[in-house]
From Swiss-Prot:
GO terms for biological process: CTP salvage; UMP salvage. One of its GO terms (cellular component) is cytoplasm. GO terms for molecular function: ATP binding; cytidine kinase activity; uridine kinase activity. It comes from Mycoplasma pneumoniae (strain ATCC 29342 / M129 / Subtype 1). This is Uridine kinase.
Amino acid sequence: MDSKKGILVAIGGGSCSGKTTIADMIYQLLRKKLKVAILPQDNYYKPYKNKSMAQRKAINFDHPDAFDWKLLWSHLDNLLMGKTVAVPMYDYVNYTRKKETIEIGPLNVVILEGLMPWFDERIAKLCKLKIFVEATGEERLIRRIERDWERGRDVASIIKQWREAVSPMYEIFVEKMKQKADLIIPWSERHEVSTNVLDFAIEHLFRKHVDPN
């Protein structure tokens, strides 16, 4: 019998594809009956504290090497064992980790949301359900400009990063995540049906996990 007390649901997809929106919709439904939390993959960027601001700005944050996979896997494993972890917080202005952390756990369901949440094989093996959210490149770019503008970025730098890192990394790494996804959801403004189905499916997966009979 699996010794883990919780289950992991991973939601992946390109930058600004709607992953966070869908993760939050599922969370709002599940929280009424289970202990659940969203764990953003972005929180597990490497800290790069020994690099200058100019060096940190030059990092390709859309490449798998930008993430601290070992820490992420360790935290997920502990959460699924029913433990509490101190989740790092990411500072988007200074391109590093914040000093403060957030404690989460114990949980029934962990929702891991990010660009390529099951890229690491250790994490892929922990997943009970892998969901890929798909949106057109044009739609994702428009949302990216809107989002990063609100974070204090200028449009020229946003488009430059999109051309040099975001778009090519999507083609090389992120899009390939679809091959191992259990479910692919095309983005639309209305997701009530799909999220309600996922709510039912995830609850069923958890109940089956804790009581296989």
